[in-house]
Amino acid sequence: AQVAVLNAMRDALPGSVMVGDSTQPIYAGNLFYDHDHPGGWFNAATGYGALGYGIPAAIGAAIAAPERPVICIVGDGGAQFSLPEVMTAVDENLPITFVIWNNQGYREIATSMQDVGVAVIGCDPTPPNFAATALSFGIPHVSAADDPAEIAAAITKNQGQGPCIVEITAPVFAPAED
């Protein structure tokens, strides 16, 4: 499901730059996803937990390549590290689609802890209300379910009109055992 969603986003916005944070879909993408052009896929999901990287990196990508749509893929946990930076995208009117995968916590970290038999502690922070956050930023918020076509439609809805937040609220990227 993770790669199917990444493929749907790529196909919905060809030539885009997809920037990622340390999230399960990005880790899966690093293994199984092919972007449509060199330099169009980059992230900090290299095993060192660089949470908070995605939002400012997407802003940099949008400034560096204004002719390309930018999609930022970040989890709800990672978004909390740099969420105020979305206001920079607002101030600069950057056409970035911030895709926030809201699985109610640090699922990548929790899964890793479970895999090695460590008690899962500190992996369930309460996420902000991203619809209210988008409203306070003065940008659109779109909710999407776990259907790749619905997610593709959501990311194109406000394309080219400044930043927006697309929140995936269903556990689309949850491990199979969840």
Q: What are the functions of these language-model segments?
A:
Residues A62, T88, T133:
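Hydrophobic/aromatic ligand-binding patch that stacks against planar heteroaromatic rings
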Residues I26-Y27, G49-L51, A79-Q80, Q104-E108, ...:
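Short gly/pro/ser/thr-enriched loop/turn and capping motifs at secondary-structure boundaries
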Residues P148-D178:
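Glycine/aspartate-rich loop-and-adjacent alpha/beta segment that forms the canonical ThDP
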Residues L13-S16, H37-G40, A65-V70, E92-T97, ...:
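Short coil/turn connectors at secondary-structure junctions
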Residues A1-A61:
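Active-site diphosphate/adenylate-binding microenvironment
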Residues A28-D34, G54-P56, L83-E85, E108-M113, ...:
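Short acidic, glycine/serine/threonine-rich loops at helix termini
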